Amino acid sequence: MAVPQIEEFYDKFSAVWEKPINSNIITTGYHINEEAVRVMKKVGITSAQITLDGMKETHNTVKHLPSGEDVFERVISNIELLNDQAPEINIVIRVNLTHENKHEYPQLCSLYVERFKGRKNIGIAPAFVLDRGASNCDKCEIKSTLFNHKERSEFILDLAYRGFNSPFIRYPEPFFNECAIRNDMAIAFDPEGYAYKCWEVIGNKEYAIGKLNDDGILTDINQTVLNRQLYGADTFDDPACSKCKYLPICNGGCPIQRIENKFEGGHNDCCTYYKGFTSDFLKIHIARKKAQEAATEK
């Protein structure tokens, strides 16, 4: 988790920044301990996304250690530790799903209810590993395990029909936002000082817009990459999207995927999971709203 570096950065940044600081963190959860919690509270972290890759056997296969340690149980215990010592931090358990482990999500939901019963500020949500249409992956064995647009929507709806809640089922979406990639004030850095506009491509230097020098100044600006990421993914410049009835409630889809499609020959499906299934989502929304109203009247 680079806890000492997080604290060092906060100390230096807060010394020159007088306005409030709001921080979030994405982590495997393995390295959370009392010292990590202390630093997380100090730097003002308000939410933590902790990733699971399935039930115990599956997760320990993906996130395995040579020692054979039960990584899954350690992560679950660390979630409890974080919630005990910093109950104000909102924890979201993100479950990476493919066709190989999708059947484990309901099991994880049951474990979540059993293990975290009575606790506040802990949630769970599926995260779909999508077929991004990579041209070099047409014959990959892994391709058949990935979700496409239709399969993702059907899985979300199936969960709802079976009584499992998820952020995807909320209709309409509770907020509208724009991706940070097109915000000229948003930036991320890798350990070597390379700068990126998108979290998803951190570490892939082809997407770096520049690099910090020894004085902390951003240099070697790649104007082509920067302009593509700031302006090359405008949904309203896409003729098909500009005529689509789902715009703007779809938020335009993922900009980096649009950039891959436009400039790199990608075949990403950037459409909302509502598309083609709006009536199904609306029926669930109306049924749940009526149930809530009926419960309130009792």
In which residue ranges do the predicted regions lie?
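C-terminal accessory region of radical SAM enzymes
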Residues: 144-173, 200-245
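Radical SAM enzyme core and accessory elements
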Residues: 192, 206, 213, 236-298
